[in-house]
Structures are given as structure tokens and as C-alpha cells.
Amino acid sequence: MNSTKVVNVIIAIFLPPVAVFLARGWGVECIVDLLLTIFFFFPGMLYALYIVLTS
């Protein structure tokens, strides 16, 4: 794991939509994560971690 990915994982824990935006840009993934984070923080965080770790 390089330092950029470590920083993205930390961002995914505290600000999930920002981490998804940095990993994939503004798209469907970012909108889904934003909605998950607004309604339920924990699923939004898990989804962001999944996106960051698989990209």
C-alpha cells in the first residue's frame, strides 16, 4: 500500500464521499456514497473503503 492509498483510506473513514470522489471522480459511485452517508454513515464508510481499496 502506498502513502496515497493510506491517506485515501483515512479520508474514507472520516469523509466517505470525498474519498470516493478522489478515487473515481464525480459519478454514480460518488452519488451513491453521498446518499449512503447522509442516511446511514456506517454503510457509506464501508462503501467508500471498498471503492478506495479496489481502485
From Swiss-Prot:
Keywords, alphabetical: Cell membrane, Membrane, Transmembrane, Transmembrane helix
GO molecular function annotation: phosphatidic acid binding; phosphatidylinositol-3,5-bisphosphate binding; phosphatidylinositol-3-phosphate binding; sphingolipid binding
InterPro entries (UniProt xref): PMP3 (IPR000612)
Entry keyword annotation includes Transmembrane helix: yes
Compartments in which it is found: Cell membrane
Entry GO CC: plasma membrane
Membrane-protein topology: Multi-pass membrane protein
Regions crossing the membrane: 6-26, 34-54
Keyword Transmembrane part of the UniProt annotation: yes
GO biological process, one term: monoatomic cation transport
Pfam families found in the cross-reference section: Pmp3
Described purpose of this protein according to its UniProt entry: Plays a role in the regulation of membrane potential. Could mediate a proton leak.
Family that this chain belongs to: Belongs to the UPF0057 (PMP3) family.
Protein name: Plasma membrane proteolipid 3
Native source organism of the sequence: Eremothecium gossypii (strain ATCC 10895 / CBS 109.51 / FGSC 9923 / NRRL Y-1056) (Yeast)
Lineage: Eukaryota, Fungi, Dikarya, Ascomycota, Saccharomycotina
